[in-house]
Design a protein with these regions (language model features):
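Substrate-access "cap/lid" subdomains that shape
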Residues: 208-250
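Non-transmembrane functional regions of envelope-associated proteins
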Residues: 2-220, 253-293
Length: 293
């Protein structure tokens, strides 16, 4: 009788776990995956530098967001040999009138701008590099959004590239472990920010996507080797990289991918990752290097 009561108790406990979490296997898999990420030895990355708009910069330049002629000033002072990735959304005209100054600075540098998915319908989708599709239609597999917040034409037409900063947190943990390289918005396909950074970095002009009966199989940047993805065009992000971080007030190094983002307290929302909270531009840096390596 004791044996049967033990079995019954075990069944009740397992049923309770199943009700509390309909997919305990998935949760265990996430725990294992996160532990693996946390145990990896950090690798120093030399070709990507995080440029932080930090407390010192806010104190010097004033409340954020800044007038865009201030951003233009830092671009003008930086080396022409670097690639500038601005992980901020310029979807409306600068009320201080700095757009023309930023546009002129962008003409002198290689700059990639950000867009962001939105739940609001949007007309038109800005200036993006298109994605050629091979095989099956991937429409039912790609993450789809009603619209995009995209940079104003004054800026996007001066940029080398524009990409979407889409990340899909895993349920039920809310942790970002992977990111889509291609998304759909307003009925069309668009590259992620990290993917477009790689396109500009490699000097390629276009993308292609191969899909089959089970979803997306790979994405290719120009003539580069295909990047194998899951069915939803996602890749896992390797978070064991270590990047040099500098203030935007510091001299900007040359021959680097410079990824700009806000770290000043109260101005940015950190993203949950398997190794702890990170600022959004740091997540982008890990994603870029994951694909590079």
């Amino acid at each position: 009788m004791t044996k049967w009561w033990s079995v019954l108790f075990t069944i009740v406990i397992l049923a309770g776990i199943k009700i509390w979490n309909p997919d305990p296997v998935k949760s265990l898999r996430y725990i294992q995956y996160d532990f693996f990420q946390q145990q990896q030895e950090q690798v120093q990355v030399d070709d990507i530098v995080l440029v932080n708009i930090d407390e010192k910069a806010i104190q010097q330049e004033g409340q954020y967001p800044w007038p865009r002629d201030i951003v233009a000033k830092y671009l003008n002072e930086g080396p022409a040999e670097s690639l500038y990735v601005l992980n901020m959304i310029y979807s409306e005209d600068d009320r201080f009138g700095g757009d023309q100054a930023l546009r002129e600075a962008m003409f002198l540098k290689a700059v990639v701008l950000s867009s962001a998915p939105t739940t609001q319908l949007s007309d038109g989708v800005g200036n993006f590099v298109g994605v050629a599709t091979l095989g099956k239609d991937p429409k039912g597999w790609l993450y789809e959004f009603p619209g995009l917040l995209f940079p104003i034409d004054t800026l996007s037409t001066a940029a080398y590239g524009v990409g979407a900063t889409a990340s899909i947190p895993d349920e039920p943990t809310g942790v970002v472990r992977r990111a889509p390289l291609i998304i759909r918005a307003s009925g069309s396909q668009y590259p992620s920010l990290a993917l477009d950074v790689l396109r500009v970095y490699t000097g390629e002009p276009s993308y292609s996507l191969k899909a089959g009966d089970n979803g997306v199989e790979w994405i290719r940047i120009g003539r580069q080797d295909p990047i194998v993805t899951d069915s939803f065009a996602q890749v896992p992000i390797a978070y064991w990289n270590k990047f040099e971080q500098i203030s935007i007030l510091d001299p900007l190094p040359k021959d680097k991918v410079l990824i700009f983002g806000v770290t000043a307290e109260g101005y940015s929302n950190p993203v949950p990752t398997p190794v702890g909270a990170m600022y959004p531009h740091e997540v982008q840096a890990h994603l870029v290097h994951t694909m590079l390596s």
